[in-house]
């Protein structure tokens, strides 16, 4: 039977002599006519049933040759595997095995960025390192699901995983919602507390307040804040209170709230804390924000800048150098995360320490051994280094 215009399976069975004890294979040929009219011929994927027929054994025998070798004699197993190899059969499909066992032995990680970002961002790399440490110890595989080209929701819906870790999702992330609709065991890291999902996090508000309090106690009364995106709309610029309050990323909403509450508790007016938002998360983004906050008249210029991540804080340090401002003599800078680069910065960066590695490890453990993993709330601590000091006018 010939194929149609767009290519169809067709033709009668073709007999293949494998030379293995008289085994015979019957595989369907297919022909495909591509868009340019070029016809391609090949063999459809060999099935377990065809291998069984070739060897004159049951399908269960072929399946056992792969998954339960102790059920067969060594000679029979070798004959089945050799025949399968010659026929081009690669073994039972992973999807089929997972369906039969009721599990895939795979955990998924839902990322809020594309994969190139995930592999280049120090905090995400540390988090994934912790996840893989736990999955490797448990003999599980890992599937990364990136938020690229708007396809994450479909990928989550179709993913053959036993559980999902959602890393810093937005409050209304559609991919996270898809996982919960599937009733997929889910742990959220750095995101909203959500019905139907477990969580692993830190007290972002209290930790940020501690960093702001440190600067205020040094004598800083004019603060700048650099934050990563609050909404996925690409906005760059100064942030008003309404935009802060409606932020869709819980981590940064809470960190801003901590900075502001510490300032208010010290009697500083709202105007004393100027917030600048960057849609991207890189040293270059932090540098751009630093230029925006520092290139203003003296009476508006902050004497200290709080960055919601260390990556952005490193950019602020770069901006200060480019503007000829000495840190900490002219400007104090504090970050958040305590990535490895923060201790090597010039000067070394004051920051809030959190173990992203441990959080990643515990997210995976909560899925691997539900109910026996460590506490959901992880500790933080302020690490004071050489990037913060009293302001120039402080006695």
Write out the residue ranges for each language-model feature.
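N-terminal helix-turn-helix DNA-binding module of bacterial transcription factors
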Residues: 5, 11-103, 395
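Short acidic/polar active-site loop segments enriched in Thr and Asp
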Residues: 58, 105, 162, 220-222, ...
